[in-house]
Amino acid sequence: MKRIAMLAAACVIAVPAFAQNVATVNGKPITQKSLDEFVKLVVSQGATDSPQLREQIKQEMINRQVFVQAAEKDGVAKQADVQTEIELARQGILVRALMADYLQKHPVTDAQVKAEYEKIKKEQAGKMEYKVRHILVEDEKTANDLLAQVKSNKSKFDDLAKKNSKDPGSAERGGDLGWAPATNYVQPFAEAVTKLKKGQLVDKPVQTQFGWHVIQVDDTRPVEFPAMDQVRPQLEEMLRQQTLANYQKQLREQAKIQ
């Protein structure tokens, strides 16, 4: 019911005077057309059209009309802050409708998706990702002590990370951060990672804003770019946002803004 109530607040539907009414509230009609449109809206959100749903929506529309009439009678509707909210809601509805209409008239094409895919794939070509583990501590001395222990016996890394690392996310996994490109990490952590080869350990602890790190690269591999179908939804959404951004820029350039 709450979900339907929220939709009702945003649902403004103009109907002809001759439309068939499903109810009246103090002479104010609730038309069959407005009910049908409201049902269509709710069904588009995942509900199933049924007599029970239609009755529920009708009762909610009646409740809304009762409250609206009370607000108008008591003068609430004329309050400045209420008028501001109404205007903002109206603007929001118009903006969303305009964007939807523009995207319908300017849909993302397969050619655009393919071009964007190839562009990103080319940008990622030759890039590496790293399987990294680290031990994070608060001071340099502790980091140096731990680094010395690992250098003497790399098999100790797992236990030392579990016992000493301040990174709760990786400590329980022996410091393992999993596979990721170096760009996922802060500098100078990322810089240290890219300088290490498979199985190598840093020569000295690395300091970041989080503390001091003992870093080891367990493995490296080229970034495996996903097939286009796997990322198509994300590419389409990105292109839609670009389309809207360009449309907004165009409208602003045409507008007289002072």
UniProtKB/Swiss-Prot annotation:
Q: Name one GO molecular function term.
A: peptidyl-prolyl cis-trans isomerase activity
The EC category is isomerase
Catalyzed chemical reaction(s): [protein]-peptidylproline (omega=180) = [protein]-peptidylproline (omega=0)
| Residue ranges of domain PpiC in the record | 127-219
**Composition bias, kind Basic and acidic residues: at what positions?**
158-175
Record carries keyword Transmembrane helix: no
Q: Which UniProt keywords apply?
A: Isomerase, Rotamase, Signal
Q: Where is this region: Disordered?
A: 158-178
Which EC number applies?
Answer: 5.2.1.8
Does the keyword Iron belong to this entry? no
Signal peptide region: 1-19
Question: What is the superkingdom listed in this entry's lineage?
Answer: Bacteria
Name the protein family. Answer: Belongs to the PpiC/parvulin rotamase family.
Q: PANTHER family, alphabetically?
A: FOLDASE PROTEIN PRSA, PEPTIDYLPROLYL ISOMERASE
Name-wise, this protein is Probable parvulin-type peptidyl-prolyl cis-trans isomerase
